[in-house]
Amino acid sequence: SDVYKRQDIGFVDFAGSTIVHSVGGWIALSAVLILGPRIGKYSDANKGKFTGSSFPLAVLGTLILWFGWFGFNGGSNGAMDEAVPLILINTFLAASFGLLTGLGISFALFKKPDPYYVILGPLAGLVAITAGCNSMTSVTSIFVGIIGAVVAIFVNEFLNKFEIDDVVGAVPVHLAAGVWGTIAVGLFSDLEILGTGLTRLEQIKAQFIGIVSILSLIHICRCRRSYACRS
């Protein structure tokens, strides 16, 4: 459906920042915490050796995902009407400014473009805007994409600092950016477009309730299976 809306609380997630992305991110987080890092990943002897096998292919994959996201978000509208152009423009802007944010942070930290940040930025922007791409202004979408990239990069560095081995960046991109995007619906979306009948504060509360509900359900269902994988 175009909008996931719990009628009792008014939770809204247009194209799945939570229902699609955060679900995968919560599952990934529980798995990496239970399974632990790859052998030798954080040892001094192997420092810098655990890198991607082909960054050009990873960038190509990112561009393919970016292109496919127009169908993902636009198709979630369920009809080819006047809402679709705004959805596509917001999707593009969030991803573009996520890319620029990742590039800017990599230059600030490393004095050169870091391929991983260049990949992380647009993907985080795409995930973040997915929940509210139909109900935000273009300027707001830019802000959501920028913050999504910043949040994802921060979470990625946080995981590395505490030696939590997320091989493909599922937690920073899908979980962190997805949670941010879901909260952003309550903060910035046009309440008339959402159609929940809630005030701004009530909508923010509904978004938090939805996030926590998904978190609870996922960890109850998933943790037992992750422990089985470890054994």
Q: Language-model segments: what does each one mean?
A:
Residues P85-S96, T137-I147:
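Structural signature of hydrophobic alpha-helical transmembrane segments
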Residues K5-I9, G74-E82, I193-Q203:
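Membrane-interface helix termini and inter-helical loops of multi-pass transporters
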Residues D2-Y4, H219, C223-R225, R230:
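Short, small-residue-biased leader/transition segments that mark boundaries at the very start
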Residues G52-P56, P113-P122, G169-V171:
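Cytoplasmic-side transmembrane-helix entry/capping segments in multi-pass membrane proteins
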Residues A83, I87, L198-S216:
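Structural signal for the N-terminal portions of transmembrane helices
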Residues A15-I27, F92-L93, I119, T140-F143:
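Membrane-interface loop-to-helix entry segments
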Residues G25-L33, P37, T62, W66-F70, ...:
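Transmembrane alpha-helical segments of multi-pass membrane transport proteins and ion-pumping complexes
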Residues S1, K5-G75:
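Glycine-rich, mobile lid/loop segments that gate access to catalytic sites or pores
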